[in-house]
Design a protein with these regions (language model features):
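Trp/Gly-enriched beta-strand surface patches
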Residues: 1-76
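Residue-identity detector for glutamine
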Residues: 5, 46, 100, 109, ...
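A generic structural micro-environment signature
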Residues: 9, 42, 80, 92, ...
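Short helix/loop capping segments that flank catalytic or ligand/cofactor-binding pockets
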Residues: 12-13, 27-29, 82-84, 91-96
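Short Pro-Gly-centered flexible turn/kink motifs
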Residues: 72-90
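Terminal amphipathic helices with adjacent charged low-complexity linkers/tails
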Residues: 88-111
């Protein structure tokens, strides 16, 4: 997974953002110009169109972004399910643990678990008011 932190952010400077996947990630970059390319656009990034491996460059400054790349083989007549994991954690260790936990779960199971967690949170307070 690709982890990022902005210590200069006033509200969330201590937090760690992450981008991971349910499948192996083969290369990453945090350099927007590498991904988009000199004459590319966000709709047609040169790294994707050229099938290029990303450099692994992760540095502060410039124009950052988060890009992870994977090579996926789809068999003729087949299908492949891919899940992208985008989140936030208190520490890098917690971010890595979240990615590991959710990487191994089936998407439908993750969705059901998420709905159950939100229901538990949202259903705790019920307010009734007179008309």
């Amino acid at each position: 997974a690709l982890l990022a932190q902005n210590p200069y952010g006033l509200d969330f400077g201590e937090r760690v953002a992450f981008l991971g996947a349910s499948h192996p990630i083969h290369s990453v970059t945090a350099d927007r110009s590498e991904f988009i390319g000199r004459h590319g656009t966000t709709e047609y990034p040169q790294a994707v169109l050229g099938g290029l491996a990303l450099s692994g460059r992760i540095e502060a400054g410039d124009d950052p972004c988060a890009v992870v790349a994977s090579d996926i083989d789809i068999p003729a007549g087949g299908d492949v399910t891919l899940s992208w994991l985008l989140g936030d954690a208190a520490t890098p260790a917690e971010a890595s643990a979240l990615v590991q936990t959710h990487r191994g779960k089936d998407f439908d199971q993750r969705l059901a678990d998420n709905e159950k967690a939100w229901r538990g949170f949202l259903d705790t307070i019920q307010v009734e008011t007179p008309d």
